[in-house]
Swiss-Prot record:
It comes from the Viruses. The keyword Membrane does not apply. It comes from Moloney murine sarcoma virus (strain m1) (MoMSV). ATP binds at L100, G101, S102, G103, G104, F105, G106, S107, V108, K121. The keyword Nucleotide-binding applies. The active site is at D229 (proton acceptor). Belongs to the protein kinase superfamily. Ser/Thr protein kinase family. Keywords: ATP-binding, Kinase, Nucleotide-binding, Oncogene, Serine/threonine-protein kinase, Transferase. Residues 94-376 form the Protein kinase domain. Gene3D superfamilies: Phosphorylase Kinase, domain 1, Transferase(Phosphotransferase) domain 1. It catalyses: L-seryl-[protein] + ATP = O-phospho-L-seryl-[protein] + ADP + H(+); L-threonyl-[protein] + ATP = O-phospho-L-threonyl-[protein] + ADP + H(+). Its EC number is 2.7.11.1. This is Serine/threonine-protein kinase-transforming protein mos. PANTHER family: SERINE/THREONINE-PROTEIN KINASE TNNI3K-RELATED (PTHR44329), V-MOS MOLONEY MURINE SARCOMA VIRAL ONCO HOMOLOG (PTHR44329:SF285).
Length: 376
């Protein structure tokens, strides 16, 4: 079967099921179970485990000129039920370019889908904790069908995998950019053009990026979604210099958290950015993301790492002794603007979640501060 869109070969080693996608065979039965139990808070039609067929979750459909549009239904393949046709990724249109990164979760590739640049995440089965891998895969789809300028959009996702692969599934996402906020802060970048990051992250730029992130959080929280792993490494910067929140593998829906109040479970994330209530095993709220944002804003402002020392000691000190990164630097004390920024950061990482501002109030304060300084 020939590809309808030719793909140039790459010298990088990539999985066979992508480089030879026209020869992929997928299991005809079976689907990865959802880690979420069915309850009154989770309707049956939203549970991925209800249908026994392998499924995908396409969120946009191709139209003219290979562009992707939201909310339209693609033509149904002959002989396929309506739902199964809607749940089909056009694998022949997947064309890998190169790998962007890899880790315990799997690998992310830059690619094109129907001629449009995308990022493709291949989620691996974790032999030590398969349940955690499954939970992470489905959590990535919490933003299914959502669209916002400051959120990396999911294009499609599928539990269909080659029979010989170690993959739980595939997620096709909007290509958010080559550079993360972490790379901009600390100087390392994968951008094809050299970037002297240490000279370019001005206070005005920090506030601009901060507003991008807060706008994304405000939208997520309005949809009752918590990110729960917000940090510079999970914020992409597009070619248009717009920050986009990515990596929703730890995200939660508020209604699902309410379902689990009687049986708390471990919430993933990065210990340096986790709120005290999360470290104590309490139920998460949107204010946990605000805490993480406060640490992230401190990193942007100081260009330093939050903590040093063993993780378990840091976690204990954050909860027991209210340990936080230092706000004593000149960037916070030498000017009225710095002192205002200091107050904003301090309010974000208050020990009690109720004392932290919501995303809407934070957006207002950051915009007022950004308007008070000279243009970038």
């Amino acid at each position: 079967m020939a590809r309808s869109t030719p793909c140039s070969q790459t010298s990088l080693a990539v999985p066979n099921h992508f480089s030879l996608v026209s020869h992929v065979t997928v299991p005809s039965e079976g689907v990865m179970p959802s880690p979420l139990s069915l309850c009154r808070c989770l309707p049956r039609e939203l549970s991925p485990s209800v249908d026994s067929r392998s499924c995908s979750i396409p969120l946009v459909a191709p139209r003219r000129a290979g562009k992707l549009f939201l909310g339209t239904t693609p033509p149904r393949a002959p002989g396929l039920p309506r739902r199964l046709a809607w749940f089909s990724i056009d694998w022949e249109q997947v064309c890998l370019m190169h790998r962007l990164g890899s880790g315990g979760f799997g690998s992310v590739y830059k690619a094109t889908y129907h001629g449009v640049p995308v990022a493709i995440k291949q989620v691996n089965k974790c032999t030590k904790d398969l349940r955690a891998s499954q939970r992470s895969f489905w959590a990535e789809l919490n933003i299914a069908r959502l669209r916002h300028d400051n959120i990396v959009r999911v294009v499609a996702a599928s539990t269909r995998t080659p029979e010989d692969s170690n993959s739980l599934g595939t997620i096709i996402m909007e290509f958010g950019g080559n550079v993360t906020l972490h790379q901009v802060i600390y100087g390392a970048t994968r951008s094809p053009e050299p970037l002297s990051c240490r000279e370019q992250l001005s206070l005005g730029k920090c506030l601009k990026y901060s507003l991008d992130v807060v706008n994304g959080l405000l939208f997520l929280h309005s949809q009752s979604i918590l990110h729960l792993d917000l940090k510079p490494a999970n914020i992409l910067i597009s070619e248009q210099d717009v920050c986009k929140i990515s990596d929703f593998g730890c995200s939660q829906k508020l209604q699902d958290l309410r379902c689990r109040q009687a049986s708390p479970h471990h919430i993933g994330g990065t210990y340096t950015h986790q709120a005290p209530e999360i470290l104590k095993g309490e139920i998460a709220t949107p204010k946990a993301d605000i805490y993480s944002f406060g640490i992230t804003l401190w990193q942007m402002t100081t260009r330093e790492v939050p903590y040093s020392g063993e993780p378990q000691y840091v976690q204990y000190a954050v909860v027991a002794y209210n340990l936080r990164p230092s706000l004593a630097g000149a960037v916070f004390t030498a000017s009225l603007t710095g002192k205002t920024l200091q107050n904003i950061i301090q309010s974000c990482w208050e020990a009690r979640a109720l004392q932290r501002p919501g995303a809407e109030l934070l957006q207002r304060d950051l915009k007022a501060l950004a308007d008070s300084i000279e243009p970038m």
